[in-house]
Amino acid sequence: MPLTWKDSGLRWYWVAVLVFFADQLSKQWVLANFDLHESLNLLPFFNFTYVRNYGAAFSFLSDAGGWQRWLFTIVAVGFSTLLTVWLRKQSASLLKLNLAYTLVIGGALGNLVDRLMHGFVVDFIDFFWAKSHYPAFNIADSAICIGAVLIIWDAFLSGKSETDSAEGVKK
């Protein structure tokens, strides 16, 4: 018998929804309150600075001419769909993997909406030291990175993956 949404990883989909809305609300706040490249200094090493990212993480392919928007759209839809299918097939008890997948889904969909609505992703979290700035990012990027770390942790660092357990994945 297939897992129901209550018994499957889909039970954790609320995390993706929370990430998505937190990301979108924060970006709407930035768009409503900042001009492009405007900064608000919050700490000696931390600003909110509105920048536009036409590429992927660390502005990868940002000056590629526009085609990358559609590539990243396809990748976001593909990964979100694949991870949702995996959530449906695994037990709700697999906390680490369910959390990881839903963080990635929420982040991917948050950045996807930006790409489709604006043609770029709104970034604003700006850490720096002296004059060296880490590339600006957003809540969606953070969720994707945390989710990826959790997936790697599960796959490589924990010795035995949560999915190795007999009750972990419904085949």
Curated annotation (Swiss-Prot):
This protein's GO CC annotations: plasma membrane
Name the pathway: Protein modification; lipoprotein biosynthesis (signal peptide cleavage)
Task: Quote the catalytic residue positions.
Answer: D123, D141
A Gene Ontology molecular function term of the record: aspartic-type endopeptidase activity
Q: Does the keyword Transcription regulation apply?
A: no
Q: Record's InterPro entries?
A: Peptidase_A8
Return the EC number: 3.4.23.36
**Out of the domains of life, which is the source?**
Bacteria
Membrane topology annotation? Multi-pass membrane protein
Which residues are listed as membrane-spanning?
12-32, 67-87, 93-113, 137-157
Alphabetically ordered keywords of this record: Aspartyl protease, Cell inner membrane, Cell membrane, Hydrolase, Membrane, Protease, Transmembrane, Transmembrane helix
Localisation per UniProt entry: Cell inner membrane
Catalysed reaction equations from the record:
Release of signal peptides from bacterial membrane prolipoproteins. Hydrolyzes -Xaa-Yaa-Zaa-|-(S,diacylglyceryl)Cys-, in which Xaa is hydrophobic (preferably Leu), and Yaa (Ala or Ser) and Zaa (Gly or Ala) have small, neutral side chains
Gene Ontology BP terms: proteolysis
Q: What does this protein do?
A: This protein specifically catalyzes the removal of signal peptides from prolipoproteins.
HAMAP family found in the cross-reference section: LspA
Would you tell me the protein name for this molecule? Lipoprotein signal peptidase
Q: Which organism is it from?
A: Shewanella baltica (strain OS195)
**Gene it is expressed from:** lspA
